[in-house]
């Protein structure tokens, strides 16, 4: 690999080890017992008197104490054997790494190169390569078996309450089954309603599925900029994001060392990695959109395909004829990729090369099974611009491109807005399903108001929960730094947790069979004052415990039947437990009735006597009533 690097640069340091009171477990599917599908088991206290709780896990080997993490070597490349077993691929030398791939960075500022090099694979003509092609042929791949086991959380049969949960939810036409089988996964992919983003060169990947009939997924964006960040920080942010629940990660780097940063991330990522190739292509022509060419973009696509990127955001729906539709907008074109292509189209007065070369783009991506994430380059960047003609014209074009990509054998999902007030969100979901043949929808929020810079993880979390309920398959997180700056690792965690809440709330509302298990387990822990279980069952045990410890830090407080909100005398749950305990001491049901009835009658008689004593008037002097009440206390 002819990459210049600075030998003084340090290797990335990442967070490892299990989450509190958790352990990594692995499920083995009946149809492929050699597979090890990761889950996280939350270990409950003995006082719980119930089994430990398995939950979906995105953290990869980083939370498995039995695995030695070597970021310099990367994660185990388990999927290569699956790909070779299917056949239809070839190993080849691949393109040389060029100085412009890393922004022509000088040796003094070059990041340390990832040393381990593996020759890339590509599909052979006339052979099935993509998960879509295998699914249409009726073939269930190991990736399909893997994700079915993962969605079921290792269960071998449906939950007893699965049918009731489905009936209780409102799925808006989604067809969530009581139990996920590999055949169901295959059929959803064959219909284009779900994708497994899994480049054949991302051998470190733990496969996952995106589709509205599966668990709602979330994406975390990372990436450097020309102003700040480094390879070390971005690898750390990737590992940090998946620790807290990011299902996929997008590397949106726009600064130096783009190729090297991406290589480090991919070789150490167990989750799908997405990119926006136009960003790197723009860096290769010194940031001037007018100088972009199809040849340069094509070379960038192949470069990233060979590295193992799992999905590309491609803004092929930004057409010359739509650009004028944005002229009356409050915030114009806010997508970076959309604005780049709009400027190119206007400068050359030509149709976008992403649109005119779309067939060829499909052919390239198919050879590596890279999924499309058809970008919404004309998404609204303000509430005022939501659902306008520019936005929906592009969406209609994305529907046309989806069908072309499907015909070519490529997997597709569709990107969505943006900034949309609550009452305009559902029409976005409905129109996307109609125009794009139910291809998975992947939205940025949407943000439901524009008035809260610094809190846009909340403004967008509201919209994300809603559109997830309506059928959006994956939600792209927004951090508190949105519109303000590049997020650091704390912002990444806040964004991920916010969007895990939104995704889970959507799954509950849809009636997903397993969604409520964790809620119920936490509610039981809360009612029984099992504080440690309550912390550990939450999405962020560390923060929950730290908030509790701010006022009740002693270990004895972890078994106390109250918290600092209400104290021991006013805790509603403690009072309810006292009532239950009292009722339990009265074994004879008739005695309970007599006792309660007698208590009520005595109280009524006492108040009647008091009323007469004070003169029998409807309206009494307030001070006299207060004085009289003292005698009753």
Swiss-Prot record:
Pathway the protein takes part in: Cofactor biosynthesis; thiamine diphosphate biosynthesis
Family designation: Belongs to the ThiC family.
The name this protein carries in UniProt is Phosphomethylpyrimidine synthase
Which intervals of the chain are annotated as region Disordered?
Answer: 1-22
Q: Which cofactor does it need?
A: [4Fe-4S] cluster
EC number from the UniProt entry: 4.1.99.17
The cross-references to InterPro entries, in alphabetical order and at most eight, read: ThiC, ThiC-associated_dom, ThiC/Bza_core_dom, ThiC/BzaA/B
What GO molecular function annotations does the UniProt record carry, in alphabetical order? 4 iron, 4 sulfur cluster binding; carbon-carbon lyase activity; zinc ion binding
Cite the binding residues for substrate: 221, 250, 279, 315, 335-337, 376-379, 415, 442
Q: By which gene is this protein encoded?
A: thiC
**Cystine bridges: which residues?**
none
- Any Pfam family from its record, for instance, is ThiC_Rad_SAM
Residue sites binding Zn(2+) per the record: 419, 483
Cofactor binding notes: Binds 1 [4Fe-4S] cluster per subunit. The cluster is coordinated with 3 cysteines and an exchangeable S-adenosyl-L-methionine.
Please name the source species.
Bradyrhizobium sp. (strain BTAi1 / ATCC BAA-1182)
What does the annotation say about its assembly with partners? Homodimer.
Compositional bias (Polar residues): 1-13
């Amino acid at each position: 690999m002819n990459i210049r690097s600075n030998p003084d640069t340090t290797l990335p340091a990442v967070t490892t080890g299990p989450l509190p009171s958790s352990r990594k477990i692995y499920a083995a599917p009946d149809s492929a017992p050699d597979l090890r599908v990761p889950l996280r088991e939350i270990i409950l206290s003995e006082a719980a008197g119930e089994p430990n709780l398995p939950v979906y896990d995105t953290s990869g080997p980083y939370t498995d104490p039995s695995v030695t993490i070597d970021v310099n070597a990367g994660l185990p490349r388990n999927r290569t054997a699956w790909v070779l077993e299917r056949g239809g691929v070839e190993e080849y030398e691949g393109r040389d790494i060029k100085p412009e791939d890393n922004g022509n960075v000088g040796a003094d500022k070059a990041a340390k190169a990832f040393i381990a090099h593996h020759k890339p694979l590509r599909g052979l003509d006339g052979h099935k390569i993509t998960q879509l092609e295998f699914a249409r042929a009726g073939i269930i791949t190991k990736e399909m078996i893997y994700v079915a086991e993962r969605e079921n959380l290792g269960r071998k049969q449906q939950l007893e309450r699965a049918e009731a949960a489905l009936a209780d939810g409102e799925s808006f036409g989604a067809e969530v089954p009581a139990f996920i089988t590999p055949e169901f996964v295959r059929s959803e992919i064959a219909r284009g309603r779900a994708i497994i983003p899994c480049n054949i060169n991302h051998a470190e990947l733990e496969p996952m599925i995106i589709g509205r009939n599966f668990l709602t997924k979330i994406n975390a964006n990372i990436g450097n900029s020309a102003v700040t960040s480094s390879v070390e920080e971005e690898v750390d942010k990737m590992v940090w994001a998946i620790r807290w629940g990011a299902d996929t990660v997008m590397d949106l780097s726009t600064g130096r060392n783009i190729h090297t940063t991406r290589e480090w991330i991919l070789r150490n990522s167990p989750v799908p990695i997405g990119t926006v190739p136009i960003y790197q292509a723009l860096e290769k022509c010194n940031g001037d959109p007018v100088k972009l060419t199809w040849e340069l973009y094509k070379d960038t696509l192949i470069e990233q395909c060979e590295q193992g990127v799992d999905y590309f955001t491609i803004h092929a729906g930004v057409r010359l004829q739509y650009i004028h539709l944005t002229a009356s907008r409050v915030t114009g074109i806010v997508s970076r990729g959309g604005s780049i292509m709009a400027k190119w189209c206007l400068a050359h007065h030509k149709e976008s090369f992403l649109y005119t070369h779309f067939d060829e783009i499909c052919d390239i991506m198919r050879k590596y099974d890279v999924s499309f994430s058809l970008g919404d380059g004309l998404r609204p960047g303000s509430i005022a611009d939501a659902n306008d003609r520019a936005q929906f014209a592009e969406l209609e074009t994305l529907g046309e491109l989806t069908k072309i990509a499907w015909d070519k054998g490529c997997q597709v999902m569709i990107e969505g807005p943006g900034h949309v007030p609550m009452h305009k969100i559902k029409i976005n979901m409905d129109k996307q399903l109609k125009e794009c043949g139910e291809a998975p929808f992947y939205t940025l929020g949407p943000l439901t108001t524009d008035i809260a810079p610094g809190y846009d993880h909340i403004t967008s979390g509201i919209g994300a929960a809603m559109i997830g309920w309506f059928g959006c398959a994956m939600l792209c997180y927004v951090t508190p730094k949105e519109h303000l700056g590049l997020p650091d690792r704390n912002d990444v965690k806040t964004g991920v947790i916010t969007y895990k809440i939104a995704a889970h709330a959507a799954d509950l509302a849809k009636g997903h069979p397993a969604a409520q298990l964790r809620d119920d387990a936490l509610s039981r822990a809360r009612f029984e004052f099992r504080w440690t279980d309550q912390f550990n069952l939450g999405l962020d045990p560390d923060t929950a415990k730290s908030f509790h410890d701010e006022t009740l830090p002693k270990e004895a407080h972890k078994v106390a039947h109250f918290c600092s909100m209400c104290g021991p005398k006013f805790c509603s749950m403690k009072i309810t437990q006292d009532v239950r305990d009292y009722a339990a001491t009265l074994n004879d049901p008739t005695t309970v009735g007599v006792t309660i009835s007698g208590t009520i009658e005595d109280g009524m008689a006492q108040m009647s006597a008091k009323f007469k004593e004070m003169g029998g008037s409807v309206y009494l002097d307030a001070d006299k009533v207060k004085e009289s009440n003292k005698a009753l206390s």
